[in-house]
Amino acid sequence: MTCFYGCFALGSLYWTLYLLLFSETPQVFYVSEFGWVSSVIFLHLLQYTLSSDGERRFLTGKALIAPLIGVPLCVFYCTFGDVLSNLLWCGMMIVVSYHSIRGLAYAQIQTGTACKMRYFHIGVLCYVAVEYVLWISGCLWPGYSISAPYCWLDLLLTGCLFALLPATGKAVQV
């Protein structure tokens, strides 16, 4: 979890400092993008580490919602921006949301401490959903003013990131 937060924070720090120092968004955004991509990779590793063998083997059709939503959104995002970056991001979000939906379905049939994983999976799904909506708002309503939907959704994303920590804490309590 620390690696997830650390990478996300470093990517955001670069972006914010560049914006404050030069009054424009970075022209070479791959520095911050590398941090953000790394954070999602660490989130997936955390998902894998927290899941049990039974959860990893659990199959449910509900998890197919992830690619059914993610693939059309990926096509939509690719019409507005860099194709490779959008394919990478959407692919990672599909994988993370697939595992969270599967984990949430598995946690619903568990009892005791195993069912506490649902808080973590709900937190991850909230993060993915807000990221998707944030990207949609960036495509449809560009701009960085305080009145832009992107600004408010970015604030909501920050709230989701903060909420993910106690959700993970509940998942790992013994």
Could you describe each region identified by the protein language model?
Residues 1-7, 54-65, 111-124, 173-174:
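Membrane-interfacial loop-to-transmembrane alpha-helix junctions, especially the N-terminal start
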Residues 1-21, 33-40, 118-140, 157-160:
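Hydrophobic alpha-helical transmembrane segments of multi-pass membrane proteins
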Residues 4, 13, 17, 67-79, ...:
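Intrinsically disordered, low-complexity N-terminal regions enriched in serine/proline/glycine
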Residues 15-64, 100-107, 164-172:
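Internal transmembrane alpha-helix with an interfacial aromatic "cap," most often the third helix
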Residues 97-174:
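C-terminal transmembrane-bundle signature of multipass membrane proteins
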